[in-house]
From Swiss-Prot:
This is UPF0102 protein STH1475. SUPFAM superfamilies: Restriction endonuclease-like. The lineage of its organism: Bacteria, Bacillati, Bacillota, Clostridia, Eubacteriales. CDD domains: PoNe_Nuclease. One of its GO terms (molecular function) is nucleic acid binding. NCBIfam families: PRK12497.1-3, PRK12497.3-3, YraN family protein. Belongs to the UPF0102 family.
Amino acid sequence: MSRRVGEAGEQAAAEFLTASGYRIIARNVRFRSGEIDLIAQDGGVLVFVEVKTRRGRRYGTPGEAVTAAKQRRLARLASLYLARLGSEPPPCRFDVVEVEPGPDGRLRCRLIQNAFHA
């Protein structure tokens, strides 16, 4: 997947989440060991969001690409982010947004709340 497709997917996911009532706090939060695509707030919950964009289902659904190893890495990155806050961490969860082109070519998003637990 090209970087441009990934960026378009992240933009579509951010717009979708905002329309769903989330407040985007940060995008592409980088650490030495990786990156958190989106960090958002949903009510009183801090949400770490993994965005997976696919052009088709040849290799499965986008969410299937969030392997156990990817989940562990995202959990470690979330811990690093929370340590930066320095205060008592709020309730947190991990969501996945699957992004794929629809029949009309426009990107479609599907939210998987509480996609995994760390």
